């Protein structure tokens, strides 16, 4: 079911409009929103108004905030806390700041207040706080309650293109800079400070900036990076210095493309396999067990490939997002042609990511301001003529809440269907599509919980 299918009683829409007045999302400061979108075309603003009006029918939760500067990176941390507010829990979201030299730049960790009903009963709370409770309620300068609030800031001397936490040592955060250097921090040992944070590792190789950065989920000491300098660097991180001093690290192996490298990933199932996507129109697979730097497999597309992601549930599936506006799904056992090509974006696709909870579901985002959620298991579903007009059968949901290009998005690792997304207009959103869409079953209108 696509987003345009959702419907609900007119009385509910009227009620919500009265309750929240002009701001369905509540957390967005209306003045900042006007400033952030004033340069946009009238058509984009009209699309946003339509989306906002229909939001009560499309989502269980939508939370949004406007930052002082845009972020190019967003990622959920695994931490979950009981919240001091009854019926709420706190998640942690990491993002950066990209001030273009106008201000200091940071890696931020924010508390995100979410309703507890989003958590499956089988998932317990993970906490680094005694008692497992986030004891603070967060407010803005005007005393208004904030659903998304920064709780830690790591000051960096330079803009951060991408930041990723180590899934086997979540206190470690790797950050790729505009200089090409990669810093690794221990976030537990860094307090909020106006002084530049001291990394525990400095990874030096890339001569230009990059956006590709990924930890090996099977080996805590392995990291891969990619940059505009056309190289892919495979790193093996040594033991940290006992005195806390910074260690310089050089790559274990360097692989090469013929143009800028846009994305890099380790396979979830085959821990020796690295994939890289490049402006040279290729997806290349690298076997870290083999000496030398020759690609084990190369896939050629018609235009540059911006993103890739290995399926965490199937060792053979890999998805790509490309400048040709398509998402493709490949079977690594037969890479001569994709097993699925997904068409609905109307501009470059810059990010693809498989859902950690559903083997056949993935999301994509790009320059068309949209995040699309797909279910490739629906590829051969028969649709009615009305349904067919709304898009291909694989298109499960269209998130249209952003008014600028998508910078990054991330599925929450333990909260099913919860996504955080960021766009170039400084807006960060946290959302969960309605259960009537994700589960293909009706949910009473009273169960729709619009968070502000």
UniProtKB/Swiss-Prot annotation:
Q: What SUPFAM superfamilies is this protein classified in? A: WD40 repeat-like
Q: Which cysteines form disulfides?
A: none
One matching Pfam family is CAF1C_H4-bd
For this entry, list what GO says about its biological process. Answer: chromatin remodeling; regulation of DNA-templated transcription
SMART domains documented for this protein: WD40
Q: Spell out the GO cellular component terms annotated for this protein, sorted alphabetically and separated by semicolons.
A: cytoplasm; nucleus; Rpd3L complex; Rpd3L-Expanded complex
What would you give as a GO molecular function for this chain, any one? histone binding
Under the heading PROSITE patterns, the entry gives: WD_REPEATS_1 (PS00678), WD_REPEATS_2 (PS50082), WD_REPEATS_REGION (PS50294)
| Subcellular location, record wording | Cytoplasm; Nucleus
**What keywords would UniProt list here?**
Chromatin regulator, Cytoplasm, Nucleus, Repeat, WD repeat
Q: Which domain of life is it from?
A: Eukaryota
Would the keyword Phosphoprotein be found if you checked this record's keyword annotation? no
The family assignment reads: Belongs to the WD repeat RBAP46/RBAP48/MSI1 family.
Subunit text: Component of the HAT-B complex composed of at least HAT1 and HAT2. The HAT-B complex binds to histone H4 tail.
Q: What is this protein's function per UniProt?
A: Regulatory subunit of the histone acetylase B (HAT-B) complex. The complex acetylates 'Lys-12' of histone H4 which is required for telomeric silencing.
Per its record, how is this protein called by name? Histone acetyltransferase type B subunit 2
């Amino acid at each position: 079911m696509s987003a345009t299918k959702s419907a609900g009683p007119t009385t509910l829409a009227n009620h919500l409009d009265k309750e929240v007045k002009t701001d369905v999302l509540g957390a967005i400061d209306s003045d900042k929103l006007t400033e952030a979108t004033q340069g946009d075309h009238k058509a984009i603003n009209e699309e946003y108004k339509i989306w906002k009006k229909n939001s009560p029918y499309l989502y269980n939760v939508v939370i949004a905030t406007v930052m002082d500067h845009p972020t190019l990176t967003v990622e959920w941390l695994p931490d979950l806390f009981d919240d001091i507010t009854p019926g709420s829990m706190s998640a942690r979201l990491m993002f950066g700041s990209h001030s273009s030299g106008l201000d200091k730049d940071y890696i931020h960790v924010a508390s995100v207040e979410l309703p507890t009903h989003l958590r499956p009963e089988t998932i317990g709370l993970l906490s680094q706080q005694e008692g497992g409770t986030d004891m603070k309620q967060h407010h803005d300068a005007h005393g208004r309650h904030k659903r998304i609030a920064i709780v830690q800031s790591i000051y960096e001397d330079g803009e951060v293109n991408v930041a990723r936490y180590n899934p086997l040592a979540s206190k470690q955060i790797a950050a790729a800079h505009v200089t090409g250097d990669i810093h690794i921090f221990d976030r537990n040992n860094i307090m909020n400070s106006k002084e530049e944070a001291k990394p525990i590792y400095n990874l030096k190789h890339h001569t230009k900036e990059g956006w590709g950065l990924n930890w090996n989920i099977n080996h805590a000491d392995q990291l891969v990076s990619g940059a505009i300098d056309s190289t892919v660097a495979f790193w093996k991180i040594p033991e940290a210095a006992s005195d806390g001093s910074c260690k310089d690290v050089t790559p274990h192996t360097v692989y090469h493309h013929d143009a800028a490298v846009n994305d890099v990933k380790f396979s979830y199932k085959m821990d020796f396999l690295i994939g890289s996507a490049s402006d040279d129109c290729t997806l290349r697979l690298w076997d870290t067990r083999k000496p030398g730097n020759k690609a084990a497999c190369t896939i050629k597309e018609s235009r540059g490939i911006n993103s890739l992601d290995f399926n965490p549930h199937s060792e053979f599936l890999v998805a790509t997002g490309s400048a040709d506006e398509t998402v493709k799904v490949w079977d690594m056992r037969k890479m001569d042609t994709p097993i699925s090509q997904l068409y609905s974006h109307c501009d470059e696709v810059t990010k693809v990511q498989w859902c950690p909870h559903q083997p056949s579901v993935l999301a994509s985002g790009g320059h068309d301001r949209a995040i699309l959620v797909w279910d490739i298991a629906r590829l051969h579903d028969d649709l009615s003529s009305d349904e067919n007009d709304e898009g291909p059968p694989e298109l499960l949901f269209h998130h249209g809440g952003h008014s600028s290009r998508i910078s990054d998005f991330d599925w929450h690792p333990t909260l099913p269907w919860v996504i955080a997304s960021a766009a170039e207009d400084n807006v960060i959103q946290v959302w969960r599509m309605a259960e009537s869409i994700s589960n293909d079953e009706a949910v009473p209108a009273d169960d729709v919980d619009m968070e502000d």
